[in-house]
Every structure is written in structure tokens, then in C-alpha cells.
Amino acid sequence: MKLKCAILDDYQQVALKMADWSALADRVEVSAISAHFTDETELAVHLQECDILVIMRERTPMTASLLARLPQLKLLITSGMRNAAIDLAAAAERGVVVCGTRSGSAAPMELTWALLLGLAKHIVPESVGLKNNGPWQRDLGVTLQGKTLGLLGLGKIGGQMARVAQAFGMRVLAWSQNLTAERAAQEGALLAPSKRALFEQSDFVSIHLVLSDRSRGLVGRDELAAMKPTAYLINTSRAAIVDRAALVDVLQQRKIAGAGLDVFETEPLPADDVFRQLPNVLATPHVGYVADDNYRAYFTEAVEDIAAFLAGQPIRRLG
């Protein structure tokens, strides 16, 4: 009897096309589910006969209670090599092997620049106005050359951001808890003397940190209050790094110029969420990693993970 594998949250209905699953055909029956289930009981009904699950980032949390309702589950694969929505301890207790796939940094970096440029050039309101016969040239754009980009985090994506910023002729400041002046200089950036200084001096602040106990809530009321009234905040990292209530306040009161957001504490974003309504927010539905090359890598390596597991030699194990 073949093992049953389900790919969850295949929103674009491309998972089965992005990799060659035929190598598994003799031993595994693979199906993809495009619908997103918010009710755990309903989800468990759909998955209770599955031996293998392939999940996309944190779209569907793998909680202890859900794992307990999946008696057949043997292998859980996530895109990326980190997933805070998986209860690794509960998976281990149940003997579920958890594996990951590698993730490219180009796509989220490019999306960050798309948001930044969209805000600076007022692309969405200008386009909407044009299509609706609104005012011609409604807003005054912001020139990037000579402006300061503040990077909260200078890892792989942050470093790429710094290099692109220099091509625009921007000054780059960077800060994180362990960042040194030498490391910043390697990317052509200056080390900000403090976190507050980064927010005070930057025209654009872009967040590029992994969510952890240290980074959760790292951007709060004090940091947002220190920003220039003409400055923009961009977060394509993780929503919980920023104090949501504080961000909503400064946006509603227009104490900063605006925000570009690709990540939210609840995803999909509820229909009545304030971030859907604020005119000074440019928001996208967590599409930073949703790109052709990333998806090919995710699902190709998911096939590899399954094949290795079937051979008794799991690869890219988490936990």
C-alpha cells in the first residue's frame, strides 16, 4: 500500500508542477490542497490518513493538539530550515521526523525593495488615480539618492539590501545586538551607535531579523516615536518583531509617513483588519518568498526529503 502525502496551502495550485514527483510514484500517493483551513478539527479530518505532510512556511501551524490527531503521520516537511509554527517537541514525542528545505534570499529582498519604492514613489495611489480618472500627478515622490536606509539586521538579506541601496546612492546604517563595525563595513554600511540612533537618522527602516525571544517586540513605541515624520518602516521579516498596537498608533496619527508590510501576526489577514484600511500602508499577503525559483527549490527538495526518508536516511532534519 502506498503512503499518502498531502501538500498543504497550495494557494497558487502549482506545487505538483514545480518539481518532478514521479520518482516517488511507486511508493507515495501525492495530492495538493489549495484551500486553507483555520479550524483544526476540520483540518484533522482531511489529514488523518496522511503519512507525510509538506507545509509552506507558517501558513498552517503544526501544534501539539493537531499532531495528536494525526496518528498516521511519519514525516513532516516544511519549506525553509526554520518554522516557529511547528511544535518540534510534540513531533519528536510522536516519532514524527521533521525536515526542511533550503530557501533563497533574492525573492524577499526584491519584494522589500518593491515595497520601499512603491511607498517612495506613491505607485499604488498614482496608479489607482490614473485608472479612475483621478488627479494627474497627485503626489510628490521621494528621491532615494542621498537618503539614509536603516537596516535592522545585516544577515544574508540585510547584506543584499545594503548593496542595492548603494547602487541607488543611499547612505546605509545598520544595527543589531551583535553587529560590529567591521561586519557592517563589509557590506558598505555604517554601524549605528544605537538602535535608537538607527531609527532617528533613517529615512527608511527595513527589518531583517529572525524572530526569536530577543527580537520579539524589538521595535516598540520608543523606536517608532524616534522616527522622522517623513520616514517609512518596511517589515518583510516577521510581524511579531514590531509592536502592532504601537505601529497602528503612529500610522493612524501620521507620526511617520507610512509602512510597507508583508508579514502579519494573523495570516491570512482578517477581512476587517486595520492594516487593510490604512491609506499610508502598502501591504502584500506575505509574498516575499512566493516566487518561481523559491518554489522550485522548495518542492524539489521536498521530493528529495521524502526519498531520503524512505531510504532510511532522512536529510535536512530539524529539531
Regions found by a protein language model. Give the residues of each.
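An N-terminal-biased, well-structured beta-alpha scaffold segment characteristic
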Residues: M1-C99, E200, G220
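C-terminal helix-to-coil terminal segments
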Residues: K2-L3, A92, G100-L111, G129, ...
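Phosphate-binding beta-alpha-beta segment of Rossmann-like dinucleotide-binding domains, i.e.
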Residues: R94-V96, G100-T148, L152, R163, ...
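N-terminal Rossmann-fold NAD(P) dinucleotide-binding loop
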Residues: G158-G159
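Redox-cofactor binding/interface segments in oxidoreductases and associated redox assembly factors
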Residues: I52-I55, T78, S206-I207, N235, ...
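Short, conserved active-site loop motifs that form the nucleotide-linked donor/cofactor pocket
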Residues: V28, V96, A189-L190, N280-L282
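Glycine-rich Rossmann-fold phosphate-binding loop(s) that bind the pyrophosphate
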Residues: D10, L154-G155
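Rossmann-like adenosine-cofactor binding region
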Residues: V45-Q48, P61-L66, N178-V274
